[in-house]
């Protein structure tokens, strides 16, 4: 199926199977809907999977010292061939670099603020980005370790589900066009900025409205004035400059914040 071919491709690109006959991997999970399918196909490939699932119920775990300690212990005890995550986690990239263990990840969201972290530059990374624009922006920071790889689907699971539905269910759910995905309202970071000034809010609203009239061209970043950037930073958003790749404040504001606002507006 599509997904098993792509997972196999990921492993070959990353490791080249240099005489490896036994594979043990650490799968750091946070609750992505893509994780169960990836996990099932890792198992189908005969890979022994150690799952770290604390973040399933503690969403702040990856930013805590406890996470560093837990990953350190797991890497020391199990010595996995590689660590895998859906999306990119800087803390895992750091720990894998320290232990000289390969870190594989596959993005399923865009934008991802964590990709702006300098840890994407480690040679132990194998970062697969599903969005071409995302790939074109980040690949120069680690050209030998960042790859473009579109999303895949578990065709077998979906075919099985389709075969099992009743005639009435088919009538209820058959449409010419379907949208399955997040509305982004639950993950829009601008909603959390209670102290955003009227000037900044109006500026963002005008960009959002303009973007709805133009298809196929992303002009957000070039539309941000220096004055707006400084005004936006007054919300006390933390841009840890020593951890950012180059000067990416403008890109982060454009895509991580305003981009989410546009996505929510478009989908609702």
Residue ranges of model-derived segments:
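Short, Lys/Arg-enriched N-terminal segments with co-localized hydrophobic residues
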Residues: 1-22
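Low-complexity, compositionally biased segments
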Residues: 7, 19, 46, 72-75, ...
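Nucleotide-sugar donor-binding catalytic core of glycosyltransferases
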Residues: 19, 24-34, 144-145, 150-268
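Extended catalytic core of nucleotide-activated donor transferases of GT-like folds
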Residues: 29-140, 157-160
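Generic secretory/membrane-interface signal
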Residues: 1-4, 47, 125, 170
């Amino acid at each position: 199926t599509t997904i098993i071919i792509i997972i196999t491709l990921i492993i070959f690109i990353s490791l080249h199977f240099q005489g490896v006959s036994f594979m043990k991997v650490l799968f750091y999970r946070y609750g992505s809907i893509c994780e169960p399918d990836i996990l099932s196909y890792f198992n189908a490939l005969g890979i022994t999977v150690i799952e770290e699932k604390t973040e399933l119920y503690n969403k702040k775990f990856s930013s805590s010292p406890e996470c560093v300690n837990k990953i350190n212990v797991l890497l020391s005890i199990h010595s996995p061939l590689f660590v895998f995550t859906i999306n990119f986690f800087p803390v895992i990239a750091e720990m894998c670099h320290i232990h000289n263990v390969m870190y594989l990840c596959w993005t399923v969201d865009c934008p991802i603020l964590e990709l702006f972290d300098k840890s994407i530059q480690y040679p132990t990374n194998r970062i697969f980005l599903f969005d071409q624009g995302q790939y074109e922006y980040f690949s120069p920071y680690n050209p030998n370790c960042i790859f473009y790889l579109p999303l895949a689907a578990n065709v077998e699971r979906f075919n099985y589900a389709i075969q099992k539905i009743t005639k009435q269910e088919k009538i209820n759910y058959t449409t010419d066009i379907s949208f399955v995905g997040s509305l982004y309202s639950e993950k829009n970071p601008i909603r959390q900025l209670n102290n955003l000034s009227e000037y900044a809010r109006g500026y963002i609203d005008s960009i959002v409205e303009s973007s709805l009239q133009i298809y196929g061209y992303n002009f957000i970043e070039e539309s941000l004035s220096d004055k707006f950037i400084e005004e936006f930073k007054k919300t006390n958003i933390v841009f840890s400059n020593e951890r950012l790749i180059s000067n990416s404040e403008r890109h982060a504001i454009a895509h991580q914040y305003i981009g989410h606002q546009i996505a929510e507006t478009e989908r609702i």
